[in-house]
Amino acid sequence: MAAPLQIGVSVDGTDPASSLRALAETADAAGAANLWLACHLFNREPIACAAAVLSASRSLGAVLMAMSPYTVHPVYAAMAAATLDELFPGRVQLCFGVGAPAALEAVGVAAEHPVETLRESIEVARELLSGEPVKFAGTRHRISGRLAMGAHRLPVWLAASGPRMLELAGEKADGVVISAGTSPAFIGWCLNIVRRGEERGGRAVRKAALVVCSVDADTRRAHERVRRRLAYVLRGSHHARNLQLAGTRLDQAALAEAFAQEDWQRVDALTTDDVVMRHCASGTPHEARAMVQAYRDAGLDEIVVYGMYERRQLDDVLAMMRSQDASIGR
């Protein structure tokens, strides 16, 4: 029998913090396991948002996603996660990631030596969360100290997409999360690399991905809700392999230019229904359910709903996922 598939819901910090309680209640009622709270510079801060979410529910978990060691020191990230876990035991997870290149550039930060920096960040956080005194002398971090709140052995994830980072996730992290807009074929490719890291580290990690979701009785209306959000993601050149493996025809340069010019008609025309269907769980409940199964078959343990924040629409998406089969669980 297949292991239970967990449902998560992503929060990107663009909506008012006052909406978090309702979002948490909706996700909790639908049986979601976690809210994944993104750390995007200039948006709502995820640690404060996590406290609000955890206060609004008795069982929903919170993942601090993807805390960048270039903007948040790993000691501070571990402090935040441990403090939240002290308040809400067993419901907190920590996720590291490099961070969006454009956002780092906007604050004058260069993400140098990313693989080694993330490797050391995972090691530092895990040692601190053990509750023991830490003396760490790496090439990127030097730490001497101990968390005042003692041991909080919570999961440490890594957000990854490139081969070296994916392999690092399998070797060192407790879980890997793959970004939104990725196709089942690309996720399968990613997880094969993660497994190489698992073999080297002699361990197994959990596997999650942000999946753009939209459900409606009218297929096209479902696609329209997520078309521009997906287009924004796929315009990046780093999605070239993702598009190739999915067999997707998309002119990324033209799409990036259309965004820069705010030519929304052109953005919509370039991001065809075929593109949406290959990179989202979108359409009628039956169509979306088939894509959820494809993502699951690629090897995911948790599907994190991305891009759906209006409560009624989120209700519909979570209901569709809950009806997937009997093995959806926390």
Identify the residue ranges that each predicted region occupies.
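Active-site-adjacent structural elements that line small-molecule/cofactor binding pockets in enzymes
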Residues: 1-330
